[in-house]
């Protein structure tokens, strides 16, 4: 057996409850891309995955995929082949860049909240400044809905067009877009292209 796959045998050592956690973690990573430690309902799942990372690494290597993790951010991410990556339109790509900048700005502030928080109006102002135009209401709603599904943000308002609504910025934002990704996104924006982002779907 390939030495890298030896860890697959560890699945036999899991208890029934642990095996259920294993299946839940796989489903979460494949369907939602990220497991985020700071989300209360995912903390135990995050800890379980880190404890059993060799098993997960071996399992994902069988499908030519990988897990990427940053324990300082508390994020585990599924990285699949190119054909499994999300394709973002121009508004969505701009929004990711805006949220990345807002996340970096906000994380330097002292806060009692688990995640940096901004208002929808904060996002609109930054987005409009970056693009040199005004984001339309329909586009705003679509962008926030899409990126919420991608587990980059959470909108704490039933009305995505409410300027006073709050947006929680997840640590998956910087994790999913590194400096190379930022440069590629900016270049693609200049060419008017869609952009490939982190793997998974937005269910």
Give each language-model segment a name:
Residues 9-16, 80-114:
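Short alpha-helical segments that sit at the start of domains
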Residues 1-79:
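Eukaryotic partner-binding/assembly regions in large regulatory complexes
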């Amino acid at each position: 057996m390939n030495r890298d796959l030896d860890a697959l045998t560890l699945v036999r050592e899991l208890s029934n409850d642990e095996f259920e956690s294993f299946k839940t973690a796989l489903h979460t990573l494949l369907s939602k891309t990220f497991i985020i430690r700071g989300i209360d309902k995912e903390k135990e799942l995050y800890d379980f995955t880190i404890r059993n990372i060799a098993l997960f690494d071996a399992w994902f290597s069988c499908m030519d995929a990988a897990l990427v993790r940053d324990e300082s951010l508390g994020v585990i991410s599924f990285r699949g082949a190119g054909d499994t990556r999300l394709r973002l339109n121009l508004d969505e790509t701009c929004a990711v860049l805006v949220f990345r900048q807002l996340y970096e700005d906000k994380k330097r502030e002292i806060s009692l909240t688990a995640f940096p928080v901004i208002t929808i109006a904060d996002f609109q102002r930054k987005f409009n400044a970056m693009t040199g135009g005004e984001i339309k209401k329909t586009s705003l709603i679509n962008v926030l809905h899409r990126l919420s599904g991608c587990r980059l943000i959470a909108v704490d308002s039933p009305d995505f067009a409410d300027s006073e609504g709050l947006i929680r910025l997840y640590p998956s934002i910087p994790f999913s877009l590194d400096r190379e990704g930022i440069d590629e996104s900016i270049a693609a924006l200049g060419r008017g292209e869609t952009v490939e982002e982190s793997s998974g779907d937005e269910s």
